[in-house]
From Swiss-Prot:
GO molecular-function term, one example from the UniProt record: metal ion binding
Protein name: Cytochrome b
Species for this entry: Reithrodontomys mexicanus
UniProt-listed InterPro entries: Cyt_b/b6_C (IPR005798), Cyt_b/b6_C_sf (IPR036150), Cyt_b/b6_N (IPR005797), Cytb/b6-like_sf (IPR027387), Cytochrome_b (IPR030689), Cytochrome_b_C_euk/bac (IPR048260), Cytochrome_b_N_euk/bac (IPR048259), Di-haem_cyt_TM (IPR016174)
Annotated family: Belongs to the cytochrome b family.
Binding site residues for heme b b562: 83, 182
Compartments it resides in: Mitochondrion inner membrane
Note: Heme 1 (or BL or b562) is low-potential and absorbs at about 562 nm, and heme 2 (or BH or b566) is high-potential and absorbs at about 566 nm.
Gene behind the chain: MT-CYB
């Protein structure tokens, strides 16, 4: 008798996705981040669900409801800090996952890659709205500054901002709708993840060599299930170390002050995982220009397949482009640092140089390096 997992309509899908899936025999730990992102999403949905049971999305009680969760709810502090730091782990895994995709040329899987870019935007939107919910100073002013950027859109900008706010400033209506969207978006993300995997399983996984691995496949289970479990254990160790020993290390002290529209914090900045984009936004001394640069800094990922000039897929055997890739990685760290600094000399100049470098490396230098490497390796035909 054939195993039920191969016959049952529902179990068959699970079997073909996680058990009998043919996987390349040589995928490294860089391929662990997909499953880690899945675990992060599950953690965020579960902790978020329990937080929503005690949270109130009203400007007069939102801040105190979060305090109540931390002080009075059984293990409320644990749930709250797992959710807050879980978001940080989510973004660390996201950035590494995208970086892996860029390094090994996974963007040649066009559908999978484009769904991934949409997922990145969706997760960023969710995280932004979640940061507004505790209704601290940085929640309020972050929401005010970022939503205000939409007013740079010609003609419809101001109307659009007031429509999103539900009034003439960030207030009760804004908080309520942000809570509603913050609750629903993770489920939309989960649906998109299924589509992401659906497209991935049409082609099969990429691998570090960038070569076709059809001739050398192994079953996903037990090889990669056990490997993924190791990754999950390490992820949970890092997350719980953050939660139990340094719960506030990635947060902003200003968010422990209740929101006050009459008192602006000295330095308004988003959570650490948005700082690189915030630095690019601030580096352009024009509102609309800054907003466009901000959007393009992420949207540029969608045009990576068009910038592929090399005859090879990944960067494994391409030392020139490899060097540029790691300079780009360092450049992103510089942008992250600058995003958290005040707008004054020399930070303004450093931010502008890092922003120019970011776009130059991706749009000009890497494609040129690809062509040079083709010639050096005599891949001219």
């Amino acid at each position: 008798m054939t195993n039920i997992r191969k016959k049952h309509p529902l179990l068959k899908i699970i079997n073909d996705s996680f058990i009998d899936l043919p996987a390349p025999s040589n995928i490294s730990s860089w391929w662990n981040f997909g499953s880690l992102l899945g675990i992060c999403l599950i953690i965020q949905i579960l902790t978020g669900l329990f937080l929503a049971m005690h949270y109130t999305s009203d400007t007069s009680t939102a801040f105190s409801s979060v305090t109540h969760i931390c002080r009075d709810v059984n293990y409320g502090w644990l749930i709250r800090y797992m959710h807050a730091n879980g978001a940080s782990m989510f973004f660390i895994c996201l950035f590494l996952h995208v970086g892996r995709g860029m390094y090994y040329g996974s963007y040649t899987f066009m559908e999978t890659w484009n769904i991934g870019v949409i997922l990145l935007f969706a997760v960023m939107a969710t995280a932004f709205m979640g940061y507004v919910l505790p209704w601290g100073q940085m929640s309020f002013w972050g929401a005010t500054v970022i939503t205000n950027l939409l007013s740079a859109i010609p003609y419809i900008g101001t109307t659009l901002v007031e429509w999103i706010w539900g009034g003439f400033s960030v207030d009760k209506a804004t908080l309520t709708r942000f809570f509603a969207f913050h609750f629903i978006l993770p489920f939309i993300i989960a649906a998109l993840v299924v589509v992401h995997l659906l497209f991935l399983h049409e082609t099969g996984s990429n691998n570090p060599s960038g070569l076709n691995s059809d001739a050398d496949k192994i079953p996903f289970h037990p090889y990669y299930t056990i490997k993924d479990i190791l990754g999950v254990i390490l992820l949970l160790m890092v997350l719980m170390t953050l939660v139990l020993f340094f719960p506030d290390i990635l947060g902003d002290p200003d968010n422990y002050t209740p929101a006050n529209p009459l008192n602006t914090p000295a330095h308004i900045k988003p959570e650490w995982y948005f700082l690189f984009a915030y630095a690019i936004l601030r580096s352009i001394p024009n509102k609309l220009g800054g907003v466009l640069a901000l959007i393009l800094s992420i949207l540029i990922l969608a045009i990576l397949p068009l910038l592929q000039t090399s005859k090879q897929r990944g960067l494994t055997f391409r030392p020139i482009t490899q060097t540029l890739f790691w300079i780009l990685a360092a450049n992103l760290l510089v942008l992250t640092w600058i995003g958290g600094q005040p707008v004054e000399h020399p930070f303004i100049l450093i931010g502008q140089l890092a922003s120019i470098s970011y776009f130059t490396i991706i749009i000009i230098l890497m494609p040129v390096a690809g062509m040079i490497e083709n010639n050096l390796l005599k891949f001219t035909h």
